[in-house]
Amino acid sequence: WRLQSDERVDVHDRTNVRHLRGEDIGGLVDIVVADLSFISLSLVLPAFAASVRPGADLLPMVKPQFEVGKERVGSGGVVRDPRLRAEAVYRVARDAASLGLMTRDVVASPLPGPSGNVEYFLWLTYRPDENDSAEYRFDERPTGERHTDAHRSRPAARADDTVEENGEGEGDGRLWEMIHRAVDEGPR
């Protein structure tokens, strides 16, 4: 309530974020932070791209339980397989790239979701002149420690359906490196 009653906050209750446009919120913005539930980010990324200025930064939280499909979510609504979590982040990043939202980095939230799900922040920058779903492009990102490959030896819930196993993600090495680092460094 404190946030809603702050005079600096412009509340848009009853707004479907999938249909959001810059003119709905007083013009294009420079930053978007999104923590959405019960919807795939891929469904709202077009609205985000339509609501930001070129060069804007976006920080959406990827919640794998809403990205992998209900048939691949474990008991209690938790995605336990790290490869499925990595796949969820990858698919959102690829969809973002097709809209000119370039991945700069990926980091795991240090706090698991209420049910224990591990969630991830994507740092995206809007570069409308670089939207290209055939060849993934990256902005420069801060360098960090080298990730480990420890989780890759664990079996996936359905390995034949993961994008790494079926070759869908070939050619996206740098993106996978960022994702695997985030999965490796995140909560277990």
Say what each PLM segment does.
Residues 85-99:
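Short alpha-helix
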Residues 118, 123-157, 161-188:
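Flexible, glycine-/basic-rich loop-and-beta segments that form/coincide
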Residues 64-80:
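Short, glycine-/aromatic-enriched active-site segment of Class I SAM-dependent methyltransferases
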Residues 27-35:
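Short SAM/SAH-binding signature in class I
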